[in-house]
């Protein structure tokens, strides 16, 4: 079972993974007042929203209102957006990619990480994507994550290590099939924030 982005981010917040402040709206009247602008995101169970026009970055409260009016009911790849997630705007310094998933080859969890996240993750070269299998009996340790991250020239390794540790705990405790953060961003203030969420739960 796939979760909507806002549902996945609630899980993230519950487990201490930083996410942008935001509210879910289903009508224009529910739109929050954001003088500094914000991001309006359609809540549909499909990928590629950004490229399909389902995400609007707004510079003012008026633009947020217009985006909510325009995007409510929008159909993205056959899915109608009945809800929108309206969030604060984050100043992005760098985008990363991370996911934890069940590796079908050996039926164990695997951690995937790249220093090149965002909408074009599918086109990232293989040498910029690293994968490590996780022994489900032992779990994941900080040194394993740091060893993985050491293959990239990135800052804030300790923050990212902490987020991945929390993400694995969420993955294990909720018996997830997939947990993806794309992008996981470094802000201009040096914070690491989960800007999106994709979660698939076990139907059983």
Model-derived features with residue positions:
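Glycine/small-residue-rich loop that forms an oxyanion/phosphate-binding "nest" at active or ligand-binding sites
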Residues: 67, 72-77
